[in-house]
Amino acid sequence: MFQYWLQSLKKVTQKIMNNLKKKYLEEVSEKLKEEFAVKNHMAIPRVRKVVINIGLADAKDNAGILEKMSGNLGALAGQKPVVTKAKQSIAAFKLTAGQSIGLMVTLRGEKMYSFLEKLFNIVLPKVRDFRGVSDKSFDKSGNYNLGLREQIIFPEIDYKNIDKPRGLQITINTTAKNEEEGKRLLELMGMPFVKGAING
């Protein structure tokens, strides 16, 4: 039953994704071109990729945690994640270089649009007492960093397949030249910023 529901969700998400991509190409890009006086079409700000990271410090002592969370992340991202490993040994944390310490997935193209639309319209509104995300999490290059406290707010996650709530970090990498362009790009694409935060 769950698998049937998941397949149905993927079909709906695919349709939504096509709408977001279409919206960017037909509406968002044109508004950005006009507002920022962009002459070269290739210079119009766009989302380049979305990177999702989950830190699993306890995975070094329990391989089952890594396997279970790999399934969770793969389900919510729509793509198989890669394992991140410690680059150096840290005695204080009993960490050895090469040990598995997390998972990461990088989304581009169709899967990227699919994930963003789901994030903006389905996932974030499910956060308790949600009033919008901060517009203060951009870097100087217009990339946005978002931290979520738990993976269970994603519709693909089955409660039976989680050992405990785990946070994840989402980075939306853009081609924007600065913070202002990055903010406007995501606002037009539907990022639910705190009301009145943009240009306020």
Which residues does each predicted region cover?
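Ribosome-associated RNA-binding proteins
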Residues: 13-200
